[in-house]
Amino acid sequence: MSALKMDEEQSLNVYMQEFRTRFINRSSEEVTSQALKESYKDSAQTDAWFKKYRDGELMIEKVLEFRNEITLQNKRIEEKQKNILQEAAKQGEHEQIKEELTERIQRLREELNKKREVALANRKANKERIKELQKSATLFRERLGLEIRKLRGDKLQFVFRCINPKDLDQPYSCIISLNAEGEYEVTGCDPPLECIAEFQEKVRETRNFSALLANLRKSFTALGSQVK
């Protein structure tokens, strides 16, 4: 009778241990899955909007990164050179050691020079790219009458001008954002547009953002032509 009781207790302990292991594994998988979903959602909301309109800022950041990298490399070269010279002093005047240390210093200098050349070339290319982006922004603002404003909550406001022939500075605006599912949402049109739901559905199907802006401008233009 005592042996049977011990067997039952052992079976119960084994079952509880297996249940505990399955529970921990399942909880870990759920936490990991939820973290991946949140990570994907944040990435989709970020990448979908600023790929085109932050090119200029990214180029400037890269120039600063190259500059900081060169400064950091200079410090590292100086530290390594100092350490190498200290090693040479400890080892005395042995010619072979001095030659090896000199070669190491020379290689470090050549490496630094190559990085400087790459950084200068990238800075020059980035400056040209920034000029092109500035020209494009000027074209949008002055000729096409489109201004883009960043709002809170990862929203962008598109302000169209040069629509009303009687008042070219009159703004026609619309707010565009991404919802939790990564779909476009078009809201806050001023003045209101009756066809906004149709435009929103179409851009969700085609993902053609340029066509959405073109349709919004056409609708605002048609609305502006009715004003007397």
Curated annotation (Swiss-Prot):
This is Kinetochore protein Spc25. GO terms for cellular component: kinetochore; Ndc80 complex; nucleus. Belongs to the SPC25 family. Keywords: Cell cycle, Cell division, Centromere, Chromosome, Coiled coil, Kinetochore, Mitosis, Nucleus. Component of the NDC80 complex, which is composed of ndc80, cdca1, spbc24 and spbc25. The NDC80 complex interacts with mis12 and zwint. Acts as a component of the essential kinetochore-associated NDC80 complex, which is required for chromosome segregation and spindle checkpoint activity. Required for kinetochore integrity and the organization of stable microtubule binding sites in the outer plate of the kinetochore. The NDC80 complex synergistically enhances the affinity of the SKA1 complex for microtubules and may allow the NDC80 complex to track depolymerizing microtubules. It is found in: Nucleus; Chromosome, Centromere, Kinetochore. Pfam families: Spindle_Spc25 (PF08234). CDD domains: RWD_Spc25 (cd23784). The keyword Cell division applies. GO terms for biological process: cell division; chromosome segregation; mitotic spindle organization. Residues 61-144 form a coiled coil. It comes from Xenopus tropicalis (Western clawed frog).
